[in-house]
Design a protein with these regions (language model features):
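Positively charged, small/polar-rich N-terminal and surface patches that mediate targeting and assembly
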Residues: 1-120
């Protein structure tokens, strides 16, 4: 397992109807990194009408998003984030967010398993 790999985890929350645009933008990359989508729901920073935030058990509402996760080399992260942002943009409130975190360890299970089962 590599612990000094210069890898970055990119996480993006996007509107579900923008999925095709984002996938196309990722497939257009020279070094396509692969990715995972999950359906998620949540609330942003916005408040209700008049700036008041009122919640009761009956009226809690959530926005539906897709959470995209991918791991890439650190030198590709800025470009990938820019492409995700451009592809997911509608210009409306609630377009989503993109953020990154360093990855401390990274191993492809297939490759790591092959090393363990090699009969030299």
């Amino acid at each position: 397992m590599n612990t000094d790999n210069g890898m970055i985890l990119i996480t993006a929350l996007i509107r579900p109807h923008m999925e095709g645009h984002v996938v196309r933008a990722l497939h257009d990359l020279a070094d396509f990194p692969g990715f995972t989508f999950d359906e998620v729901r949540g609330q942003g920073r916005g408040r209700g009408q008049g700036g008041a935030y009122v919640v009761s058990d009956e009226d809690i509402t959530y926005h539906q998003y897709l959470e995209l996760r991918l791991v890439c080399p650190a030198d590709q992260a800025d470009e990938i984030c820019r492409r995700i942002e451009a592809a997911a943009w509608t210009g409306r409130k609630g377009d989503g967010v993109v953020y990154t975190m360093p990855v401390n360890t990274f191993a492809r299970i297939r490759e790591a398993g092959a090393k363990e089962h090699r009969h030299d």
